Amino acid sequence: MTPDHGPLLYEGKAKRVFAADQPDCVLVEFKNDATAFNALKRAELEGKGRLNCQISARLFEMLEREGVPTHYLGLAAETWMLVQHVDVIPLEVVIRNVATGSLCQQTPIAAGTELSPALLDLYYKDDNLGDPLLSESRLQLLGLISSQQRLEIEQLARRVNQLLLSFFESLDLLLVDFKLELGLNGAGTLLVADEISPDTCRLWDHRNSDPQARILDKDRFRQDLGGVIEAYGEILKRVQGV
C-alpha cells in the first residue's frame, strides 16, 4: 500500500523522499536497492526496503523512549515512514566499538580490537569526493558546523551509541560500528535522521562463532556472502521480539 503523498523531493541510493500533507513533514520510501563502494556495486534485493524501514522504525522508537530526539514520527506503510523535515548536516558520523573494515586498512590496528572509548569520526558527505574523513582543522576550514554544534553532535552520537550497544547486546548482537546522519528541524533542534538499519550498522551475532556466518549486516552484500535478506530478517525478528 502506498500512502497519499506529494511530489518527489529527492531520491538517494536507498530511499525516496516525498512531500507530505502535514506541515514540516516528509514521507520517506525505503527502496529495495542495495549499493556498496559508493554505488559502484549495485543490486536489487526483494524485501530489503520493508526490512530496513521496519527495523529503523523500531530503533527510532527505542531512542525516542530514551529521550533521544529523532526525525521519526511514525510508519505510513510497510516501506514508508513519516518524518520531520530537517536540514541535513552534510556529515556522516561514524562510531566504532570494534576495529574492522576501513579502520584496519588505514591503520595498524588489528581487526577485532575493542575500542574503548569508542572512536568517533566525521566524514564529509559527498559521494563525488569519496566521503573523506575530516580532521578538526578541515572541519573548521569548511565551516559546516560551529564549535558548539560539534560538541552537541559528539554528545548525541555517543549517547546513541550507548543506547544501541545495550539494546543490541540484549538481543545477543554486537554493534561493531555504525553511521549516523543528523539534521536540524525548523526549531533548530538537532535530530537523529536518515535510518538506523543493517545498511548503516555492522552487527555480529553472539550466537554464532563463525566469522562469516555471524555477520548480519550489509557486509554480506559487500563481501558476496549471500543471505542478505535472511540476515536482515533475523535482525527484524529480534528487534520486534523486545
Curated annotation (Swiss-Prot):
It comes from the Bacteria. Pathway: Purine metabolism; IMP biosynthesis via de novo pathway; 5-amino-1-(5-phospho-D-ribosyl)imidazole-4-carboxamide from 5-amino-1-(5-phospho-D-ribosyl)imidazole-4-carboxylate: step 1/2. SUPFAM superfamilies: SAICAR synthase-like. GO terms for molecular function: ATP binding; phosphoribosylaminoimidazolesuccinocarboxamide synthase activity. GO terms for biological process: 'de novo' IMP biosynthetic process; cobalamin biosynthetic process. The keyword tRNA-binding does not apply. It catalyses: 5-amino-1-(5-phospho-D-ribosyl)imidazole-4-carboxylate + L-aspartate + ATP = (2S)-2-[5-amino-1-(5-phospho-beta-D-ribosyl)imidazole-4-carboxamido]succinate + ADP + phosphate + 2 H(+). Keywords: ATP-binding, Ligase, Nucleotide-binding, Purine biosynthesis. Its EC number is 6.3.2.6. Belongs to the SAICAR synthetase family. PANTHER family: MULTIFUNCTIONAL PROTEIN ADE2, SI:DKEY-6E2.2. NCBIfam families: purC. This is Phosphoribosylaminoimidazole-succinocarboxamide synthase. The gene is purC.
